[in-house]
From Swiss-Prot:
It catalyses: tRNA(Asp) + L-aspartate + ATP = L-aspartyl-tRNA(Asp) + AMP + diphosphate. The gene is aspS. L-aspartate binds at E171, R217, H448, R489. It is found in: Cytoplasm. This is Aspartate--tRNA ligase.
């Protein structure tokens, strides 16, 4: 039906007759001529209809936005005065000879001239995706996945599919369950990741595996989370953590070069402990130059209990954040920052403005200055490398509260005061995570997942001191986003059973949930390691949006609903009966449709 795409026409096509298919992006009448901007997947080109071509001209008078049309015409060069430098096709236009209105459009529920609500955009997603910026994002996504496949193929990785209907295993989030009609009362789980299957593929001898795969997690959603998401999943045998990182870093560097024309350079490597200490986050945004500076040793003996209390507590922390040029911040802004850190459990936010560094303590302004000696103030100014015009913010509380609150404040202030270089890229690897962390019930949970191997520990050593164990794990972070994470896996039965035991999984439960894995580990399992990238998050970064829904064709809302199809929906009672499922309404429920399905 077409000979060319609208957005690919240029001066090399001048004089050629072309047939185009697409949509009316805009129509306007000028001096007896009818002009339209015609749009397809590749872009927009201007088409004009002359009254001398009566049939096409009369039809063109009927055109409205989003009519689906086909035109045949001749490509002409625009006069210099009419060249549109904002369009890739701005040097040419089409003189239409024939017009075929394929399909008409009703008035749109979306307004192309203003910002529509996200609810409207998601409800009419098929119209929202016609917008060039949305189409460009999905085209970029397609190019990224194509590039990844070429790279992985060229490095000896095999694309192998793993099951979508599998067994529920504890991986940190709730599973989406699928009832079995054949096996009454039993349920499949949609995979949170292909973790165990890719490990089993290594045990099967496939050596290098990858897959671009859908994963499912029933968890609370944020702007960068979806209930169904896509991973670039990777696993290798006989490779160390350093070797895995080397190949995956090469993939990302080449991807950025291909997509953005940017050389990311070598990725620095930082331990988890260093990242938390300096930046208050295990995914630090290194575009922001500010760092947290520990000052507990300087304030241990001061009479100001807000500082000396945490400074003398083994589980406490006192940290300062120097904000270059921050003395301009108003008292109102400081109060707002105090409220902000309260979200993270901080009880307040102490501050100190450095008006004149050369004047020493006489050049500072702060409500806490009177509680600190000249020697302590000078020591704090020296350690933080404070300069005239700076402000220091202080956090003093438990290590977790201070780290979380000051880390979040660092990011907020960096954006508020334009200190974060938003037009740059700052990748790094974060390594040496704790193997375990405290859970809400007083036990331990795996910081990554229960199949991660510890660094340099035997099962006996791990059992004796689990809280000191360091995981052989690594995360790739770019601009404050964790874009990928992985680890060396446990490849011995004894170690895997020991980890399960530390996590409170008894032998009976181990056999019930992971018997197949424990059996497989007995048969010459090779050392193996892997990593998974969040494809959606990578595309989000590479297309410059801060909302993951912008890079998914048909995403869910933060309530895990599809406004376009009205999913999830109530099931037919006959289907539920066939599955031996009874829907029980919550106490106090008033939804009649729930009651009907009881």
């Amino acid at each position: 039906m077409r000979t060319e795409y609208c957005g690919q026409l240029n001066l090399s096509h001048v004089g050629q007759e072309v047939t185009l298919c697409g949509w009316v992006n805009r129509r306007r009448d000028l001096g007896g001529l009818i002009f339209i901007d015609m749009r397809d997947r590749e872009g927009i080109v201007q088409v004009f209809f002359d009254p001398d071509h009566k049939a096409a001209y009369e039809q063109a008078s009927e055109l409205r936005n989003e009519f689906c049309i086909q035109i045949t015409g001749t490509v002409r060069a625009r006069p210099d005065s009419q060249i549109n430098k904002d369009m890739s096709t701005g040097e040419v236009e089409i003189f239409a000879n024939t017009l075929n209105i394929i399909n008409r459009s009703e008035p749109l529920p979306l307004d192309s001239n203003q910002t529509n609500s996200e609810e409207q955009r998601l409800k009419y997603r098929y119209l929202d995706l016609r917008r060039p910026e949305m189409a460009d994002r999905l085209k970029t996504r397609a190019k990224i996945t194509s590039f990844v496949r070429r790279f992985m193929d060229s490095h000896g990785f095999l694309d192998i599919e793993t099951p979508m209907l599998t067994k529920a295993t504890p991986e940190g989030a709730r599973d989406y369950l699928v009832p079995s009609r054949v096996h009454k009362g039993k349920f499949y789980a949609l995979p949170q990741s292909p973790q165990l299957f890719k490990q089993l593929l290594m045990m099967s001898g496939f050596d290098r595996y990858y897959q671009i795969v859908k994963c499912f997690r029933d968890e609370d959603l944020r702007a960068d989370r979806q209930p169904e998401f896509t991973q670039i999943d990777v696993e290798t045998s006989f490779m160390t953590a350093d070797q895995v990182r080397e190949v995956m870093e090469k993939l990302v560097r080449e991807l950025w070069q291909e997509t953005k024309g940017v050389d990311l350079g070598d990725f620095p490597v930082m331990t988890f402990a260093e990242a938390m200490r300096r930046y208050g986050s295990d995914k630090p945004d290194l575009r922001n130059p500010m760092e947290l500076v520990d000052v507990a040793d300087l304030v241990k003996d001061v009479e100001f209990k807000v500082f000396s209390g945490p400074a003398n507590d083994a589980k406490g922390r006192v940290a300062a954040l120097r904000v270059p040029g921050g003395a301009q911040v108003t008292r109102k802004q400081i109060d707002e920052y105090g409220q902000f850190v309260g979200i993270y459990g901080a009880k307040g936010l102490a501050w100190l403005k450095v008006n004149d560094r050369a004047a020493g303590v006489e050049g500072v302004q702060s409500p806490i200055a009177k509680f600190l000696s000249a020697e302590v103030l000078e020591a704090i100014l020296a350690r933080t490398q404070a300069e005239s015009g700076d402000i220091l913010f202080f956090g003093a509380d438990s290590f977790k509260v201070v780290t979380d609150a000051m880390g979040a404040l660092r990011l907020k202030v960096g954006r508020d005061l334009a200190l974060t270089k938003l037009d740059s890229w700052a990748p790094l690897w974060v390594v040496d995570f704790p193997m375990f962390e405290d859970d809400s019930e007083g036990g331990l949970s795996a910081m990554h997942h229960p199949f991660t191997a510890p660094k340099d520990m035997s099962p006996e050593q791990l059992a004796a001191a689990p809280t000191t164990a360091i995981a052989n794990a690594y995360d790739m972070v770019i601009n404050g986003y964790e874009v990928g994470g992985g680890s060396v896996r446990i490849h011995r039965t004894e170690m895997q059973q020991q980890v399960f035991g530390i996590l409170g999984i008894n032998e009976e439960e181990q056999r019930e949930k992971f018997g197949f894995l424990l059996d497989a580990l007995k048969f010459g399992t090779p050392p193996h390691a892997g990593l998974a990238f969040g494809l959606d998050r990578l595309v989000m970064l590479l297309t410059g949006t801060d909302n993951i829904r912008d890079v998914i064709a048909f995403p869910k809302t933060t309530a895990a609903a599809c406004l376009m199809t009205d999913a999830p929906s109530f099931a037919n009672p006959a289907s539920l009966q066939e599955l031996s499922i009874s829907v029980v309404a919550k106490k106090g429920a008033t939804d009649s449709s729930v009651e009907e399905n009881q």
